Regions:
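Outer-membrane beta-barrel pore domains
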Residues: 56-217
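Surface-exposed coil loops of outer-membrane beta-barrel proteins
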Residues: 1-88, 155-166
Length: 217
């Protein structure tokens, strides 16, 4: 369930629901020496409060608080349940007519869990992006070019739309293009390393090239 409100330049939302237990926190699992996997499993009640405020016609700030009432943490045979709180704050601003900048920082209070090589799993992270122009699926020929840097700890966020944005420290360069109405082509390249090792062999390099076409109905 969600309740939203708006007052002048202030927007907000209150949310309550339940997350599926088939996912782990940030979609990240860790390998142990016996070949098994462990992580922080969801399947718990979730509540959040979000606020956004327009400081000016070109700048907005936002903050979110979220709480998972009970997360099941399975760590190398040591299972326990814990409530987890999340905080996030960020902003976006228009630097020039065709240039925008955004940045966000997130953190949770889930700690004391180690990764596949014994290091504590990082529970905070940040993301920033610089974007030239904006694409619009209804505007044929519109495009955007973007670059971003992320340092996203595996326990700094509940989940993301795509797994390759989680537990990653590195750069992305890409573009969006609208070849026909209600269609977008996106191409990007991401390079970096894992924040925490998910394999007993240590942190792995991350190199992703992706091209996709999206349709809007």
């Amino acid at each position: 369930a969600e309740y939203t409100f708006e007052a002048d330049d202030l927007f907000g939302a209150l949310t309550n629901g339940r997350l599926k237990d088939s996912r782990t926190l940030a979609g990240t699992k860790f390998e142990n020496k016996s070949g098994g996997e462990y992580g922080a499993y969801l399947g718990t009640e979730y509540s959040s409060a979000r606020l956004k405020y327009n400081l000016s016609p070109v700048t907005a700030i936002g903050a979110t608080y979220g709480r998972l009432n009970e997360v099941t943490v399975a760590e190398k045979g040591n299972n326990f349940q814990d409530s987890v709180n999340f905080w996030e704050a960020g902003f976006n601003t228009k630097l020039a007519d065709n240039l925008t900048l955004m940045a966000a920082y997130s953190k949770s209070d889930l700690d004391g869990v180690t990764d596949s090589v014994g290091s504590e799993v990082v529970n905070d992270g940040w993301f920033s992006e610089l974007r030239y122009k904006q694409h619009n699926p209804s505007d044929v020929g519109s495009f955007a070019i973007f670059t971003n840097y992320r340092n996203v700890g595996a326990f700094s966020t509940i989940d993301a739309t795509v797994d390759y944005t989680e537990n990653v420290r590195g750069w992305t360069l890409g573009f969006d293009y609208v070849p026909m109405e209600n269609t977008t082509i996106e191409v990007f390249y991401t390079t970096g390393t894992q924040v925490n090792a998910t394999s007993t062999e240590g942190r792995q390099d991350v190199d992703i090239f992706r091209a996709q076409m999206e349709f809007y109905f």
